[in-house]
């Protein structure tokens, strides 16, 4: 059995359902989370809709007219994770608005550099989980995985599930 102790994975849930409402996306996250934890990975789940995340493409939208923006605290969690999984439902054949907002906000920090002068997301692993009863899982996964690799995440083969 593989041991990945020391690695941290963060699941960002783009469901449109506020806690404690049951989310099918949360159910799929839990299945993936159990597999990771079985192999020693520490995991955390953040349900985006439960937070006041301002839309936009700047690291802190309170500097651009918004009264509240909880993204900077979430971004700190993103940077502490070795693995980032963006999860969300399909609505009308596309990713949910919350999932798209997560991607926008990740991109807002894409210009930051690490200590080696590389993009801050460089060398981290990305993946996605998609739920829904509509066609379009591969399309939604394609959008998310491209959005992760563009700023530096490594996307391994078959890094999506739906």
Where are these regions (language model features)?
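Ligand-binding pocket scaffold of soluble enzyme catalytic domains
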Residues: 2-5, 9-13, 127-129, 157, ...
């Amino acid at each position: 059995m593989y041991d990945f102790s020391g690695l941290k994975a963060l699941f960002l849930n783009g469901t449109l359902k506020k806690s404690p409402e049951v989310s099918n996306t949360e159910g799929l996250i839990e299945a993936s989370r159990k597999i990771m934890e079985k192999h020693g990975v520490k995991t955390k789940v953040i349900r985006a809709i439960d937070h006041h995340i301002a839309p936009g493409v700047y690291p802190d939208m309170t500097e651009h007219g918004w009264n509240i923006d909880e993204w900077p605290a979430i971004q700190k969690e993103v940077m502490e994770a070795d693995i980032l999984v963006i999860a969300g439902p399909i609505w009308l054949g596309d990713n949910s608005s919350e999932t798209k907002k997560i991607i926008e906000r990740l991109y807002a920090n894409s210009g930051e550099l690490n200590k080696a002068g590389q993009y801050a997301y460089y060398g981290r692993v990305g993946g996605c989980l998609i739920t829904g009863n509509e066609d379009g899982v591969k399309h939604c996964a394609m959008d998310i995985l491209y959005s992760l690799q563009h700023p530096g995440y490594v996307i391994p083969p078959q890094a999506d599930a739906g």
